[in-house]
């Protein structure tokens, strides 16, 4: 992706977040964007919208189906992107919107990797640890299971990592023995 395309994506995303922040509709925007991104993940919509083999009329129809019950500002963005023939960038714009929302609200997705699935109590404790140690609000809690950790967990938030896994401790111990 070129710098010009990245700047374009960033401009669309920042503009939408700014308007929604002024109108106090950030939570509704986040819910709508997450719902649309789920559609992208469940289907091959990103490839379809960027494919020149798919007729423009079909791409217009697909994006208009996404409009539905979204907040008006998101629907306006979708319409502007269609008018400017930039539907191929929609997926990247929506991802960037989530990133902008996180930075504006200081609320980030938390990825927890553990050897076994976490209980609800453990998930709540993770949220507490993140808010206290990293000084951020927790958005969605994304849970991953990796048996190679042996025990403990890894928390990743906004490019910050807390790693208390047994695997890391064993690696550190091994390095100390050298």
From Swiss-Prot:
Molecular function terms from GO: proton-transporting ATP synthase activity, rotational mechanism
InterPro entries: ATP_synth_OSCP/delta_N_sf, ATPase_OSCP/dsu
This protein's UniProt keywords: ATP synthesis, Cell membrane, CF(1), Hydrogen ion transport, Ion transport, Membrane, Transport
Domain of life: Bacteria
One cellular-component annotation, GO: proton-transporting ATP synthase complex
Coiled-coil ranges from the UniProt annotation: none
Location, primary (coarse class): membrane
Bilayer disposition of the protein: Peripheral membrane protein
Pfam families on file: OSCP
Compartment(s): Cell membrane
PANTHER family: ATP SYNTHASE DELTA CHAIN (PTHR11910)
Summary of subunit composition and partner proteins: F-type ATPases have 2 components, F(1) - the catalytic core - and F(0) - the membrane proton channel. F(1) has five subunits: alpha(3), beta(3), gamma(1), delta(1), epsilon(1). F(0) has three main subunits: a(1), b(2) and c(10-14). The alpha and beta chains form an alternating ring which encloses part of the gamma chain. F(1) is attached to F(0) by a central stalk formed by the gamma and epsilon chains, while a peripheral stalk is formed by the delta and b chains.
Family per record: Belongs to the ATPase delta chain family.
Role description: F(1)F(0) ATP synthase produces ATP from ADP in the presence of a proton or sodium gradient. F-type ATPases consist of two structural domains, F(1) containing the extramembraneous catalytic core and F(0) containing the membrane proton channel, linked together by a central stalk and a peripheral stalk. During catalysis, ATP synthesis in the catalytic domain of F(1) is coupled via a rotary mechanism of the central stalk subunits to proton translocation.
Full protein name: ATP synthase subunit delta
Organism: Streptococcus equi subsp. equi (strain 4047)
Gene name, Swiss-Prot/TrEMBL: atpH
């Amino acid at each position: 992706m070129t710098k010009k395309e990245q700047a374009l994506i960033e401009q669309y995303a920042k503009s939408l977040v700014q308007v929604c922040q002024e109108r106090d509709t950030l939570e509704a925007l986040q819910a709508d964007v997450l719902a649309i991104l789920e559609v992208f993940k469940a289907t091959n919509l990103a490839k379809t919208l960027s494919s020149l083999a798919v007729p423009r009329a079909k791409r217009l129809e697909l994006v208009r189906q996404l409009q539905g019950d979204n907040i008006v500002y998101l629907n306006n963005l979708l319409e502007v992107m269609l008018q400017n023939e930039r539907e191929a960038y929609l997926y990247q714009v929506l991802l960037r919107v989530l990133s902008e929302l996180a930075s504006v609200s200081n609320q980030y997705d938390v990825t927890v990797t553990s050897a076994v699935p976490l209980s609800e109590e453990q998930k709540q404790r993770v949220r507490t640890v993140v808010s206290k140690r990293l000084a951020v609000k927790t958005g969605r809690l994304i849970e991953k299971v990796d048996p190679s950790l042996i025990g403990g967990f890894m928390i990743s938030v906004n490019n910050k990592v807390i790693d208390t896994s047994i695997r890391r401790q064993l690696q550190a111990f091994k390095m100390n023995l050298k």
